Amino acid sequence: MARKMKSMDGNNAAAHVSYAYSEVAAIYPITPSSPMADLVDQWAAAGRKNIFGTKVRVQEMQAESGAAGAVHGSLNAGALTTTYTASQGLLLMIPNMYKMAGELLPAVFHVTARALASHTLSIFGDQSDVMACRQTGFAMLAEGNVQEVMDLSPVAHLAAIKGRVPFLNFFDGFRTSHEIQKIAVWDYDDLAEMVDMDAVNAFRQRGLNPQHPQMRGSHENGDIFFQNREASNKYYDAVPDLVEEYMGKINAKIGTNYQLFNYYGAPDADR
């Protein structure tokens, strides 16, 4: 389907995509990510539907730590859930990020990368916040401009759903989050066509339900803990191919050339 052209910033682009693939958004505002949460809240209040035909349930928490806990709980209940944050707010989410990754929950965090406070606070952009999350087990996907945010944000959601590995999708705070560009916008019908509904249904079936109770969050001794941690490696090994697969589907729809690695140079180069 031909895409419409609209003028918007990076926050709007990420919010547009995340609304399509989310059933719950647990939010707490922090500059420069706040417009994403605000837009999603406005759209839900106006009755806008996601690709599943429902409104996104938006819940503002008392802090970013609470938002992360709500994301974790919502995912465990079988609802596709996202949040939006940056800087110190992202650091408050790290404890829950370890849990989400360890439990193979398809969380997607949209982050406007921003400097961490040191001797003083700074609202301007670097990537010290997202780099502090590399060890959590979240896959990380980055975009460099507003059109890329629109085009590639679906990859984070689609790969998380099918691959069961949570994603941190980020772009530069202010430089991209607040830059207004005229871009091609996804139609929700196109976004719906790319989602693996079998994976969505399997995720929902794994949700906590009193009709088929299960035990989570138990204690394990080192020998069993080690084996269960190793068992998750196959999901991480599959992530690059999944990302490439969904980039290919996006390329087929919109004529782009997104790949994990793009070569630029002489076609006959030998060194």
Q: What would you call each of these model-derived segments?
A:
Residues 268:
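RNase H-like, metal-dependent nuclease domains and their acidic two-metal-ion catalytic environment used
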Residues 1-132, 137, 154, 173-174:
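Thiamine diphosphate
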Residues 4, 8, 26, 61, ...:
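Hydrophobic alpha-helical scaffolding
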Residues 123-173, 185, 197:
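Conserved thiamine diphosphate
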Residues 35, 148-151, 241, 245:
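Generic recognition of stable, solvent-exposed alpha-helical segments in well-folded globular domains
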Residues 52, 56, 167-263:
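Conformationally flexible catalytic loops at phosphate/diphosphate-handling active centers
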